[in-house]
Amino acid sequence: MAKLTKEQFIESLKEMTIVEINDVIKAIEEAFGVSAAAPIAAAAAAPAAAAPTEATVVLVSAGDKKVEVIKLVREVTGLGLMDAKKAVDTPPATIKENMNIEEAKALKAKFEAVGAKVDLK
C-alpha cells in the first residue's frame, strides 16, 4: 500500500462529502482507540458531572426563636422533645443526611424562615 502524504490526504478529504468524512473519522477512532472530541469540551463537562445530587442539612445556630426551631426539628426528624432540644442546644447538629439537593434546599429555607442558621454539606 502506497503511503499518502498529508497533502494528498487533505486533497482526498476535499473531494468527500461530510457524511463520508464523518465515516472516516469514526473509522480512525475505532482503529486507534481515540476520540475526536475536543479536550476542552471534556474538561468542561467534568464539573457538571461533579455537581452534588445529595446534601446533609446541618443546624449551625438556632437563632432567637429556639422553640420554633425545636418544633421544626421534631417535625422533620421525628425525634422526641428532649432529643430535639439537645440537638438545637448543641450545634452543629446534623438534621438530615443524604437528602435530595432540592429537598435539602427547601428544608434549609424552612429553618431560615424561623430564624435558624443552616448549612448544606
UniProtKB/Swiss-Prot annotation:
Gene3D superfamilies: 3.30.1390.10, Single helix bin (1.20.5.710)
A single GO molecular function term of this UniProt record: mRNA binding
The keyword Acetylation is assigned to this record: no
Keywords tagged on the record: Ribonucleoprotein, Ribosomal protein
Gene Ontology BP terms: translation
Pfam families linked to this entry: Ribosomal_L12, Ribosomal_L12_N
A GO cellular-component term linked to this record: cytosolic large ribosomal subunit
Claim: GTP-binding is one of the keywords in the record: no
PANTHER family: 39S RIBOSOMAL PROTEIN L12 (PTHR45987), LARGE RIBOSOMAL SUBUNIT PROTEIN BL12M (PTHR45987:SF4)
Protein purpose: Forms part of the ribosomal stalk which helps the ribosome interact with GTP-bound translation factors. Is thus essential for accurate translation.
Family to which this protein belongs: Belongs to the bacterial ribosomal protein bL12 family.
Subunit: Homodimer. Part of the ribosomal stalk of the 50S ribosomal subunit. Forms a multimeric L10(L12)X complex, where L10 forms an elongated spine to which 2 to 4 L12 dimers bind in a sequential fashion. Binds GTP-bound translation factors.
Name of the molecule in the record: Large ribosomal subunit protein bL12
Organism: Mycoplasmoides gallisepticum (strain R(low / passage 15 / clone 2))
